């Protein structure tokens, strides 16, 4: 690596790395380091009147206070932080004091991983700590972490830029308290849900992510190509159609928690790669599924938070079952004053115009209704609410309503103004299903790029017979947002999709060399901030000379310095 690409701290740390090796200390040892305790457990289990407990711990050194022959550090392991008391003569009992005087005091840096063996005690200030008897270097950090300080519940020098936090999640997890807890809770959400399903006897399965037809949802897919078969394939947008095939095959209840991919926009609640759970249970309907869903979410909330109430932004959301039920057309009538019951597409278009909505000719009846609900109703449902009985045009995979053939037996659960889950009494009439697919193809021909493609193999599966079935899909990322009180999806994804990092534009070396600059000086000039020839045009030759000669000296490059006149001639040649 070019030394000019490193900061002063990075150079110092690399020099320390080399010094450790010269002393015979491997900064990245291969052997297992055996630990027997975590910081939080040590504190929780400590008793003043017991024989001091011997422990072996490992983690990052996050702070250090050196006071001559004795020092305090703060060690951070996977569960928390604990203070360690280190004295020269305890970790260096013999004549050789290098481990303390040289390694600990000078060559180790904040962020380094170390192992500590010692006993637990309480300091005079009352803090439970470890008295170190042995220190082991486990991994050297050659890039300094941001130093975030905490005192009396106040955070100082915080690492809080969202762009940096999401792009460098490893740093975010290491230095920001509370971030790791979000992902621990996410894991508990998954465990609780699986426990609920497994207790009912339903089986977890896996279905293809690469699919020949992107079916099961109305969304734009990512497309790829299989070279050996020479066919296009799609990253799945939903697992629905494959899971229903398993119900056809004889399983009574199946579920899958897996990744879906939709080639659409990114915002506070959408990521192109997201996790979804879908479950299908034979011989059930959407009424049963509503009760099943609210009990599931209540259980998850209790398991994760110990209560059914969660604060999300300014709202306190109560996940205690049962949840309110409102029909979709009833919701639209309540919030707009228009009753869409029995209206055709043109009549609904007129309603949209009266509501001053932006619509276009590609939108069919179902899309128009969906737009009305999204604009005027969805955001009003803060407490968990089932929106039921969707118009048939919006639900190509859903069974017709038993009492009204213009509607379907479908519900969506709205929480905090957003859809959380979607469920049906599944359409199992193969003739009706094929007709619905054909209607979707007509929408596609009109320009609706989210219309579903006909999956003939799925229709064939239905022709063999699928029992009455109810299915439900839930966005695991949004569920985690709610259970952890987060307002953006990026906060609950370890590595959310990010736009490419901005790269500072730089001219090639040849452009600088056209001015008479030797190639070896180009990196120095760019290190000084003159990344393009044009950046030098208005600069004072004296200042420019000081800048580049200063870098030559600071980094000990031992280049022959140009004169001020040489620099002035370079600048004069810039057109």
Swiss-Prot record:
Chemical reaction(s) catalysed: tRNA(Lys) + L-lysine + ATP = L-lysyl-tRNA(Lys) + AMP + diphosphate
Bound cofactor: record note: Binds 3 Mg(2+) ions per subunit.
Single Gene Ontology MF annotation: ATP binding
Entries under CDD domains matching the protein: LysRS_core, LysRS_N
Domain of life: Bacteria
Pfam families: DUF4332, tRNA-synt_2, tRNA_anti-codon
GO annotation, cellular component aspect: cytosol
This enzyme's EC code(s): 6.1.1.6
Binding, Mg(2+) 2: 419
Record's keyword terms, sorted: Aminoacyl-tRNA synthetase, ATP-binding, Cytoplasm, Ligase, Magnesium, Metal-binding, Nucleotide-binding, Protein biosynthesis
Xref: InterPro entries: Aa-tRNA-synt_II, aa-tRNA-synth_II, aa-tRNA-synth_II/BPL/LPL, DUF4332, Lys-tRNA-ligase_II, Lys-tRNA-ligase_II_N, Lys-tRNA-synth_II_C, NA-bd_OB-fold
Annotated binding of Mg(2+) 1, by residue: 412, 419
GO biological process, one term: lysyl-tRNA aminoacylation
Signal peptide: none
Subunit details: Homodimer.
Record family assignment: Belongs to the class-II aminoacyl-tRNA synthetase family.
Protein name in UniProt: Lysine--tRNA ligase
Source organism per UniProt: Bacteroides fragilis (strain YCH46)
Gene from which the chain derives: lysS
